[in-house]
Amino acid sequence: MSRIGRLPIPVPKGVSVEVAPGRVKVKGPKGELEVPVSPEMRVVVEEGVVRVERPSDERRHKSLHGLTRTLIANAVKGVSEGYSKELLIKGIGYRARLVGRALELTVGFSHPVVVEPPEGITFEVPEPTRVRVSGIDKQKVGQVAANIRAIRKPSAYHEKGIYYAGEPVRLKPGKAGAKK
């Protein structure tokens, strides 16, 4: 059995899980998510626990088993607690601000870059150099954060760009200089 797939998913109070053919609906205090499930996987909802069972030990079924369990667990955590990613903006004159729901970034271009949040995603700017991307869908939060980071990736030679909070700053050494 898949080590991850066989773990039961605890369902917190206030969260309901419904199983339908080909999908699992998860509802909670923060919202509702629908997870597509392979028809070969069997999802069982017991009191306070969700289990995923696979039909055989084929390689394909083993990989689907762990994937399905993780996607459902992410949905359960998302509707109960939510997900967020924090980005740091470093550089002279680099900053962010909210314009309505949209995020406006001034990151060294001749124009400000405006990022509209997709449905289910919110931006927070606690400081001009910090941006928090929040939502209930882990994949969407990560993708939006990656898209923002891609606007001005961290520079390898200068400590400027958009970083994930906690991301190590890897700087290359500059030119060694001429030897005399």
Curated annotation (Swiss-Prot):
Biological role: This protein binds to the 23S rRNA, and is important in its secondary structure. It is located near the subunit interface in the base of the L7/L12 stalk, and near the tRNA binding site of the peptidyltransferase center.
An example Gene Ontology molecular-function term: rRNA binding
Listed name of the protein: Large ribosomal subunit protein uL6
Positions of disulphide bridges: none
A Pfam family of this chain: Ribosomal_L6
An example Gene Ontology CC term for this record: cytosolic large ribosomal subunit
RNA-binding in keyword set: yes
GO biological process: one example: cytoplasmic translation
NCBIfam families (UniProt xref): L6_bact
Family: Belongs to the universal ribosomal protein uL6 family.
Keywords from the named record: Ribonucleoprotein, Ribosomal protein, RNA-binding, rRNA-binding
The organism of origin for this protein: Thermus thermophilus (strain ATCC BAA-163 / DSM 7039 / HB27)
Source superkingdom: Bacteria
Gene encoding the protein: rplF
Oligomer status and interactors: Part of the 50S ribosomal subunit.
